[in-house]
Amino acid sequence: MKDFDYIIIGGGCAGLSLAYELEIHQKLENKTLAIIEPRDEYKRDKTWSFWKIIPHNFDDCVKKSWENFSINVPNKTKFLECSNYPYQSIDSGLFYKKVVDRLKQNKNINFFKNIDEINSKNSFIFNSVPQLKKNNNDLWQHFCGVEIETKNIFLMMK
């Protein structure tokens, strides 16, 4: 069993973001980090969308950004501007490639599929795995959609 200074349980968006920030801000110098993630490989498997309220280090992973939107109800449309807090979508494939490529450059960062492979007794542990309760009434938000691009929306309305 290997010993590590830090362990991140969950190598999804939250866990990898934490590891990336620690790495780029040189908080892992002379420290070891284990990332526990059961997947065999990182590949594009989702899109994360959010309101950008603070700067982040993943602008190069943003696939789409909106600075205005509309709310439509029968017989009425309200157009809103949100340039101070744009709505952004990050492509997980771009994110994974950027982050995993950077983390693998550090020989003190290791990926594991199972926590049983490491000694966690003297480690500082970050757990990003959600503890989902059975039969709770919390909102779990998912989107499924299609993005359609046209040259001019008014041509479609003729």
Predicted regions and their residues:
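Anionic group-transfer/hydrolysis microenvironments
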Residues: I7, R39, V129-P130
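N-terminal FAD cofactor-binding segment of flavoenzymes
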Residues: S17, E21-K76, L94, C144, ...
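Nucleotide donor/acceptor-binding cores
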Residues: F4, E29-T32, S123-F124
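Predominantly flavin-linked oxidoreductase catalytic cores and closely associated redox partners
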Residues: G11, E21, H25, R102-K158
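Generic domain-boundary/flexible-linker signal
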Residues: R44, C82, N136-N137
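A conserved beta-strand/loop capping segment in the N-terminal third of enzymes
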Residues: F50-K113, N119
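Beta1/beta-strand and adjacent pyrophosphate-binding region of the FAD-binding site
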Residues: M1-A14, A34
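Conserved Rossmann-like nucleotide-cofactor binding loop
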Residues: A14, E41, Q131
